């Protein structure tokens, strides 16, 4: 399956659209937290124009559950129209906010048309409407801010940022039996080093009660920003994009969704520190499947601001 890469774009999203995105995040945070039983909100993240005159529409979603992972096959309960029902959307929905999960390229004459993504999960039907409204125009800075790069801050350098590159081993088998480990190999690199690496580390100063309050461990510090902050620097993970069975990865992969709880194995989770980048950029993992079927496993690389991915289609036999 071809990769979808968040790359160069032009234009600046208006303040109104950016504030809308922040309000959605704030509203979600203000609601009562649920472990399971809630719905999933499809999200239109924005658009930009490509050099050839076509447009890229960006989509993500908000799973209102903190623990429940939902599988919704493409069809009446998960469709994008017109032109669907299958337009590359996920069928596995991981918890909480998952930003910029897939893209749809529309022609230069798309005009005032719109795409509608309808999603029903846990008996709740929600929709998002994608169009070329100017208040949804995004650029690299907008994307970086919304995913939490530099704690949701801004940097002029990000306009020159390019996403990491991802490559899969094309010679590896893509067919396996239930319970049989499958080796997956990928290479990921961040060639430009933008944004520069940061760490959500901890610096403690053992001087008096006031200093202790100021420098207390981030695990016990309430959030002070609407957008969850993340480390800058190369990170890589495999995750299930489509498929209804459980997949176990060894080693365990860091989360690709915004889990901001302390010690949650997530780049948005304090005091998480990104693992060292292999010198050769090679990442190797084994995946074990507990049910037969066809799976799409996504190899996702990010630098804290932009993402690239490649998909591996795996056939699992009984």
Regions found by a protein language model. Give the residues of each.
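C-terminal edge beta-strand
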Residues: 309-316
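Bacterial N-terminal signal peptides
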Residues: 14-25
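Short, compositionally biased P/S/T/A/G/V-rich stretches that sit at domain boundaries
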Residues: 40-44, 135-177, 183-185, 189-195
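Extracellular acidic, Ser/Thr/Pro-rich low-complexity tracts
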Residues: 63-65, 174-177, 188-195, 226-229, ...
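Residue-level recognition of secondary-structure-to-loop junctions
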Residues: 49, 277, 287-291
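Short tyrosine-centred short linear motifs in exposed loops/low-complexity segments
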Residues: 53, 108-113, 179-182, 281, ...
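Low-complexity "stalk/linker" and mucin-like segments enriched in Ser/Thr/Pro/Ala/Gly
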Residues: 90, 205-283
């Amino acid at each position: 399956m071809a990769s979808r890469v968040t790359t160069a774009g032009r234009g600046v999203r208006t303040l109104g659209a950016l504030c809308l995105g922040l309000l959605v995040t704030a509203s979600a945070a203000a609601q009562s937290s649920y472990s399971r039983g809630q719905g999933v909100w499809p999200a239109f993240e924005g658009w930009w124009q490509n050099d050839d005159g076509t447009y890229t529409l960006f989509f993500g979603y908000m799973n209102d559950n903190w623990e429940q992972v939902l599988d919704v096959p493409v069809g009446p309960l998960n469709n994008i129209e017109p032109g669907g029902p299958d337009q590359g959307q996920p069928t596995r929905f991981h918890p909480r906010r998952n930003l910029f999960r897939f893209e749809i390229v529309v022609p230069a004459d798309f005009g005032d048309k719109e795409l509608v993504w309808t999603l029903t999960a846990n008996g709740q039907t929600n929709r998002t409407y994608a169009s070329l409204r100017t208040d949804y125009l995004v650029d690299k800075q907008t994307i970086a801010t919304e995913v939490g790069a530099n704690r949701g801050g801004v940097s002029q350098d990000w306009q020159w940022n390019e996403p990491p590159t991802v490559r899969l081993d094309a010679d590896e088998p893509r067919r396996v039996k239930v319970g049989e480990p499958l080796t997956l190999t990928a290479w990921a690199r961040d060639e430009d080093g933008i944004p520069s690496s940061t760490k959500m580390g901890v610096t403690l100063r053992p001087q008096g009660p006031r200093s202790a309050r100021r420098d207390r461990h981030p695990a016990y510090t309430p959030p002070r920003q609407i957008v969850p902050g993340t480390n800058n620097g190369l990170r890589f993970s495999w995750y299930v994009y489509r498929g209804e069975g459980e997949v176990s990865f060894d080693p365990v992969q860091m989360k690709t969704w915004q889990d901001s709880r302390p010690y949650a194995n997530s780049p948005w989770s304090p005091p998480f520190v990104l693992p060292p980048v292999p010198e050769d950029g090679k990442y190797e993992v084994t995946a074990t499947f507990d049910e037969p079927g066809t799976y799409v496993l996504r190899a996702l690389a990010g630098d804290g601001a932009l993402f690239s991915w490649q998909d591996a289609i795996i056939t699992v036999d009984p």
